[in-house]
C-alpha cells in the first residue's frame, strides 16, 4: 500500500518525460523521390510519366521538381497551401493552360520554370501572388501574347526574365519598362519587328539584353546603350557594362544606326541586310560614312479636285526616301489632320474626307518626313454646292464632264446620264444594249482610242426598283459583255467607264464611255406544277380507286362462281337429279316407267362438273319407241 501513493505522485510526470511526436508527413507520391529527413524538404518527380500534378504532395516542401512529364494543365488546387515552396520546375511538359490564381499561395517562391511547354498566352491573373519571384523562365513555348499586367506582382523583384523562342510580335513595353531590378532579359528568337524609343531607359540594372534572331531592321538609340563597352576598352568589360546581342536581324544600315556603329566592338557577327549596296557586309566593317539616308521626295499627288458638298473626297500623296518617309496632312486652316469622325489618314499617304463641307475647300499640304529631312506638296480641293436631289428613276441629268480624270460621276447621275429609252433612239450612241431578254442583255461599246493606257472597263448598273449599284470589271480588250441574272420586267440604267492610268499624275483615273437605259422583257408565266397538297390528294384518290376496283372484281368473281354452282357454295357438289333413260314419250298409254336405282355417289374430284351422256336413237315417222 505504500507503493500506491508513490505511483500516484509519479504519474503526472510521465507525459513530460516522453519524447515529442511530430506531425505525420504526407506519403511520397508514387514514382517520386522525397527528401523529408532533413530540411529543406524536397519532392523530386522528373521523368516520372505524370499526367497531372500529384495530389498527395507534402505541402511543407520547399522544392518541387516536375520536369519532363506529361502534365497538360495546372489547376488552382494543385499547388494550394504550399506557402513555403521556394523552387518550382514544370519544364518540358505539355502545359497549355494555367488557371488564374494557380500560384496565388506561393508567396515565397523565388524561381518558376515553365520553359518547354505549349503556352500560347499569359494573362493578368496567371502569375498573381508571386510577390517574391526572382527568376521567371518562359522560353520555348508558343507565346504570342503577353498581357500588360501579367508581371505586375513580381515587377519589383524580378531579376531574370527569359521570353526567348516564342512567337511574340509585340510586347507590353510599358510593363517591361517597370522591371527596375531585372539583370537579364532574353527576347531572342521571336518575331519582334520594332522596338519603341526609350523602351529600356528605366532598366538601370540590366546587364544582358539578347534580341538575336528577330525581325528588327533598326534599333532606336536609348540611354541604356551608353553603357555598351567600346572597342578601345580592354578585354573584360566592367561590371556596369551592358552585353547586347542583336545578330540575326535584317538590319537596314542607314543613318539611323550610326549611333550603334560608333560603339564598335569586335566580338559580334552582326551583318547588314539592306540597302543592296551594303547587303551581306559585316556590320562593324562598314564605315560610318556609308550609313547614309535619302531625304524624301514626293513622287505622286492628286491633281486639283472639285467635289460637291456632302460627297467624299480622297487626297493622295506618295513619297519615297530612305528610311521610308511618314506622310502627314495639314488642313487649309493649318491644323494637323488625323483620324476623326470626318477624316481618315492611311499609312500609304491617302487622306479621305468622309463628308465634305463648303468650308473644307482650300490648299491641303502633304508633308513627307524621315530622318534625312522632309518634303511638301500642295493639293487643291474645291467644294461646290450640293447637287440637286434626284430620284432613282430620274430621266434628266447633266452630261459627264470631260477632261477631269479623277472626277467620277456620282452613281445617281451616272446611272441617269445619257439614258436611252427602250423604244426611242439612244441619247449616247457610244453604248448600246441589244438582245435583251427577260434575264439577260448584251452591252456593246466602241473602241476608246483617244484614252491611252486603258487597264479595264467598268460597267455599273441598277434597276428601277432600287438604288443599289452593281459593278462588273471587264478586260481592256473587250468591247461587249453579256449581263445575266437580271430581273424580268424592270428598267435598268447602265453606264460604262474606262479605267486608265493618268500619265500626268501616275494615278488610276476613270472616264465615262457612255450610258444607256433598257428594259427587260416580262417573264412568261409558266404552267405551275401542282402544289404538294394537291399531288397528295390525287395520289390518295387514285390509290382508293384501285382498291375499290379490286374489291368489285373480287366480288364479281365470287358471284359468278356462285351462280355457276347453282346457288350452292363451291365447296359442296350439287346432287344430280335422277335421269331417265327415256328420250321421248308418245300419247299412247304406256306402262309405268320403272324407277331407276339411285346412282352411285360421284368421286369428290368430279363433284364440281357433272357430265350427263344421253344415248338416244333418232325418232320420227316409222320409228317407235323401244320398250324396255
From Swiss-Prot:
Glycan attachment sites: 81, 339, 348, 393, 462
Recorded GO CC terms: axon; cell surface; dendrite; glutamatergic synapse; plasma membrane; postsynaptic density membrane; presynaptic active zone membrane
Primary site of residence: membrane
Bias type Low complexity, positions: 406-422
Residues of the LRRCT domain: 249-295
Subcellular location: Cell membrane; Cell projection, Axon; Cell projection, Dendrite; Synapse
CDD domains on file: FN3
PTM comment, free text: N-glycosylated.
Region (Disordered): 382-430
Keywords assigned: Cell adhesion, Cell membrane, Cell projection, Disulfide bond, Glycoprotein, Immunoglobulin domain, Leucine-rich repeat, Membrane, Postsynaptic cell membrane, Repeat, Signal, Synapse, Transmembrane, Transmembrane helix
Residue intervals passing through the bilayer: 540-560
Entry's family note: Belongs to the LRFN family.
Subunit: Can form heteromeric complexes with LRFN1, LRFN2, LRFN4 and LRFN5. Able to form homomeric complexes across cell junctions, between adjacent cells. Does not interact with DLG4.
Protein name per UniProt: Leucine-rich repeat and fibronectin type-III domain-containing protein 3
Amino acid at each position: 500500500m505504500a507503493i500506491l501513493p508513490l505511483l500516484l505522485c509519479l504519474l503526472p510526470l510521465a507525459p513530460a518525460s516522453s519524447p515529442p511526436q511530430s506531425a505525420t508527413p504526407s506519403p511520397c507520391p508514387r514514382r517520386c523521390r522525397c527528401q523529408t529527413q532533413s530540411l529543406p524538404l524536397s519532392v523530386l518527380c522528373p521523368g516520372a510519366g505524370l499526367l497531372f500534378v500529384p495530389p498527395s504532395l507534402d505541402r511543407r516542401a520547399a522544392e518541387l521538381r516536375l520536369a519532363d512529364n506529361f502534365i497538360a494543365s495546372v489547376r488552382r488546387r494543385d499547388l494550394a497551401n504550399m506557402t513555403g515552396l521556394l523552387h518550382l520546375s514544370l519544364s518540358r511538359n505539355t502545359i497549355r493552360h494555367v488557371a488564374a490564381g494557380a500560384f496565388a499561395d506561393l508567396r515565397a517562391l523565388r524561381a518558376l520554370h515553365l520553359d518547354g511547354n505549349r503556352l500560347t498566352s499569359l494573362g493578368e491573373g496567371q502569375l498573381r501572388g508571386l510577390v517574391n519571384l526572382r527568376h521567371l523562365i518562359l522560353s520555348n513555348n508558343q507565346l504570342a501574347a503577353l498581357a500588360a499586367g501579367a508581371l505586375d506582382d513580381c515587377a519589383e523583384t524580378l531579376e531574370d526574365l527569359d521570353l526567348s523562342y516564342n512567337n511574340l510580335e509585340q510586347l507590353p513595353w510599358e510593363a517591361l519598362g517597370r522591371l527596375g531590378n531585372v539583370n537579364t532579359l532574353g527576347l531572342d528568337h521571336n518575331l519582334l519587328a520594332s522596338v519603341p524609343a526609350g523602351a529600356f531607359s528605366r532598366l538601370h540594372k540590366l546587364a544582358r539584353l539578347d534580341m538575336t534572331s528577330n525581325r528588327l531592321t533598326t534599333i532606336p538609340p536609348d540611354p541604356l546603350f551608353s553603357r555598351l563597352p567600346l572597342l578601345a576598352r580592354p578585354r573584360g568589360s566592367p561590371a556596369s557594362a551592358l552585353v547586347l546581342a542583336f545578330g540575326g536581324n535584317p538590319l537596314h544600315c542607314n543613318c539611323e544606326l550610326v549611333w550603334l556603329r560608333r560603339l564598335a566592338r569586335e566580338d559580334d557577327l552582326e551583318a547588314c541586310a539592306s540597302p543592296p549596296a551594303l547587303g551581306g557586309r559585316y556590320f562593324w566593317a562598314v564605315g560610318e560614312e556609308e550609313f547614309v539616308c535619302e531625304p524624301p521626295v514626293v513622287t505622286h499627288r492628286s491633281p486639283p479636285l472639285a467635289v460637291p458638298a456632302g460627297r467624299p473626297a480622297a487626297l493622295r500623296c506618295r513619297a519615297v526616301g530612305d528610311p521610308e518617309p511618314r506622310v502627314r496632312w495639314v488642313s487649309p486652316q493649318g491644323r494637323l489632320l488625323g483620324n476623326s469622325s470626318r477624316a481618315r489618314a492611311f499609312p500609304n499617304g491617302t487622306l479621305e474626307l468622309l463628308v465634305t463641307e463648303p468650308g473644307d475647300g482650300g490648299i491641303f499640304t502633304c508633308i513627307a518626313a524621315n530622318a534625312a529631312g522632309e518634303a511638301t506638296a500642295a493639293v487643291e480641293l474645291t467644294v461646290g454646292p450640293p447637287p440637286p436631289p434626284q430620284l432613282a428613276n430620274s430621266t434628266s441629268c447633266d452630261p459627264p464632264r470631260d477632261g477631269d480624270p479623277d472626277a467620277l460621276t456620282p452613281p445617281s447621275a451616272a446611272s441617269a446620264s445619257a439614258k436611252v429609252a427602250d423604244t426611242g433612239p439612244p441619247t449616247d450612241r457610244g453604248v448600246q444594249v441589244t438582245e435583251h431578254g427577260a434575264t439577260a442583255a448584251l452591252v456593246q461599246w466602241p473602241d476608246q482610242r483617244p484614252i491611252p493606257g486603258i487597264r479595264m472597263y467598268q460597267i455599273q448598273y441598277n434597276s428601277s426598283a432600287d438604288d443599289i449599284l452593281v459593278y462588273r470589271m471587264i478586260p481592256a480588250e473587250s468591247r461587249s459583255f453579256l449581263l445575266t441574272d437580271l430581273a424580268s420586267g424592270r428598267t435598268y440604267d447602265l453606264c460604262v467607264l474606262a479605267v486608265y492610268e493618268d500619265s500626268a499624275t501616275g494615278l488610276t483615273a476613270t472616264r465615262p464611255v457612255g450610258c444607256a437605259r433598257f428594259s427587260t422583257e416580262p417573264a412568261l408565266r409558266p404552267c405551275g406544277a401542282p402544289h404538294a397538297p394537291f399531288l397528295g390528294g390525287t395520289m390518295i384518290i387514285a390509290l382508293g380507286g384501285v382498291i375499290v376496283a379490286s374489291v368489285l372484281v373480287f366480288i364479281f368473281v365470287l358471284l359468278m362462281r356462285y351462280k355457276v354452282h347453282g346457288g350452292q357454295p363451291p365447296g359442296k357438289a350439287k346432287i344430280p337429279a335422277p335421269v331417265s333413260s327415256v328420250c321421248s314419250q308418245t300419247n299412247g298409254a304406256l306402262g309405268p316407267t320403272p324407277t331407276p336405282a339411285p346412282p352411285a355417289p360421284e368421286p369428290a374430284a368430279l363433284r364440281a362438273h357433272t357430265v350427263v351422256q344421253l344415248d338416244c336413237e333418232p325418232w320420227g315417222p316409222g320409228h317407235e319407241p323401244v320398250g324396255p
